[in-house]
A protein has these predicted regions:
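Juxtamembrane intracellular "pre-TM" segments in multi-pass secondary transporters
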Residues: 21-40, 233-268, 290
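Helix-loop junctions on the cytosolic side of multi-pass membrane transporters
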Residues: 156, 160, 210, 217-244, ...
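Cytoplasmic membrane-interface "Motif A"-like loop-to-helix N-cap segments
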Residues: 103-117, 318-334, 416
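C-terminal ends and interior cores of transmembrane alpha-helices
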Residues: 115-131, 334-348
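A single, central transmembrane helix in multi-pass transporters
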Residues: 43, 47-51, 55-64, 75, ...
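Transmembrane alpha-helix termini and helix-breaking/packing motifs in multi-pass membrane transporters
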Residues: 59-70, 125-130, 184-217, 290, ...
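C-terminal transmembrane helical hairpin of 12-TM major facilitator-type secondary transporters
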Residues: 327-368
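Substrate-agnostic recognition of the 12-TM MFS/MFS-like secondary transporter fold
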Residues: 40-58, 82-101, 105-120, 135-194, ...
Length: 448
């Protein structure tokens, strides 16, 4: 029997099984509209997923920052260890998670993942309450594994829940909700970590404040579990797809394809943003000690940066056009270089730091949005998913490199705020490279 016949038989069996369980018919997507029950359920589930991830990561990051109770547990630059623990599962499991999402019902996979999250949330609460840094790090790692599997599930599910004409708007709404959830998670982490650290007695948290991280996590995880239960049943898209246990095979074949044209260069420039983000998010928790402020006030710095990036992205998207798209990239890189350079030299005062972070975050939108648009436009229709998935995997690789850079520079006794100078210098290099590419591109077009 041919593989085609086997696939046909598998698809027929899946269709029969799905009919019995009354899955949502794909052809009814246009009738359902954008704000249907399934999409709203997914939107809320993703919101609480992003919030819970950032609560545990935020509290742990504050706990290992300079002057914090767990500062010495992981050595200098403990924030880099936290960043690596959160990033590695995405690097290793994104492609494998995509295969699971294709061959299984995405709504069913979501419920399984959210059920696992309930158990992990209980483990997280216990480890923070008993003051175990390594236990809390292990909990973060497991949460990252769940999120790595959920990533391809949620983005694949969007196309099954809304009509093609609503897909771009749906993606925008999900991304906006994710950014809001990240900000909420960081703010909650700042509030919780302040009271949790204040309750430390003899190296361990005491009293009711010891359970604050666990309570915050439990609220977000339970709400995410409840919202996922309202997802409609969805049929597997490729039930006969083989499971490739090699997590890197898809990356290798797609990278070879991308290297044949400008896609790989665009993806490299796009992923550089996530390298920068990883370094910056490792630096900022140390500003509690550098500026002499509370964790809550430090979370305001993070929230201000996130809001500014969002505003910059919206502005860049509004001004974007194919003709000027590439020109925005060196402008954004140059703005990042100036902003980070000034942050590395700025005095230890809250207001100037917040202002510089907001300004730098705003210009970041002019760097990332044009590259995202070019990545989508250059990728062929039949390989766009793999191209964007591979680029997403690369972004986490660069994020791990960024966390490693922070860790290495801290071990060399470089003050955290001075690392901004290194990041600014790298952004200057990227600006020069993109300007050179634009010059060559213009010369080639003129010669043609």
């Amino acid at each position: 029997m041919s593989s085609h016949d086997e696939a046909s038989r598998a698809n027929s069996a899946a269709e029969t099984a799905d009919a019995a369980s009354s899955p949502v018919p794909a052809q009814d997507a246009e009738k359902r509209g954008l704000w249907n029950r399934g999409f709203v359920s997914l939107l809320l589930t993703q919101f609480f997923e992003a919030a819970s991830d950032n609560i545990i990561k935020g509290v742990l990051t504050f706990a290992v920052a300079v002057g914090a109770p767990w500062e010495t547990v992981f050595g200098k630059g403990g924030n880099g260890i936290v960043g690596l623990a959160f990033t590695l599962p995405f690097i290793l499991l994104s492609a494998f998670g995509g295969r699971i999402a294709d061959r299984s019902s995405k709504s069913r996979v979501t419920i399984v993942l959210k059920t696992i999250s309930l158990a992990v949330a209980a483990f997280t609460a216990i480890e923070f309450a008993r003051g175990s840094a390594w236990g809390a790090l292990a909990a973060l790692f497991v949460f990252a594994i769940v999120s790595a599997f959920f990533g391809p599930v949620k983005y694949g599910m969007i196309a099954e829940l809304v009509a093609p004409s609503q897909l771009a708007r749906a993606n925008g709404i999900v991304n906006m909700a994710t950014n809001v959830a990240v900000i909420c998670g960081m703010l909650v982490a700042g509030l919780v970590s302040h009271d949790w650290k204040a309750g430390f007695i003899d190296g361990a948290p005491a009293g009711s404040s010891a359970w604050l991280p666990g309570i915050a996590m439990a609220v977000a995880v339970v709400l995410g579990f409840l919202t996922c239960l309202t997802l409609p049943r969805l049929a597997p898209q490729s039930p006969g797809l083989p499971v490739d246990l090699n997590p890197f095979s898809t990356y290798v074949t797609t990278l070879r394809f991308m290297a044949k044209g400008p896609l790989l260069a665009v993806a490299a420039a796009w992923t550089f943003f996530y390298f920068v983000a990883a370094v910056v998010l490792s630096i900022l928790p140390d500003y509690s000690a550098f500026l002499g402020i509370t964790d809550q006030e430090t979370s305001y710095l993070m929230a201000g940066l996130a809001v500014a990036i969002g505003i910059g992205c919206v502005t860049a998207a509004y001004l974007d056009s194919p003709a000027r798209r590439a020109r925005f990239v060196p402008i954004g890189a140059g703005g990042l270089a100036i902003g980070f350079g000034l942050l590395g030299l700025a005095p230890a005062r809250f207001a100037p730091t917040l202002g510089l972070l907001c300004a730098t975050g705003f210009v970041a939108g002019f760097y990332i949005i044009p590259l995202q648009s070019m990545l989508q436009a250059l990728a062929p229709d039949d390989t766009r998913g793999r191209v964007l998935g591979t680029a997403n995997g690369l972004s986490f690789v660069l994020g791990a490199v960024g966390s490693g850079l922070y860790l290495g520079l801290r071990h060399l006794d470089m003050p955290s705020h001075r690392i901004f100078l290194v990041v600014g210098g790298l952004c200057l290099v990227v600006m020069a490279v993109t300007l050179r590419w634009l010059t060559r591109r213009s010369a080639t077009r003129t010669a043609a």
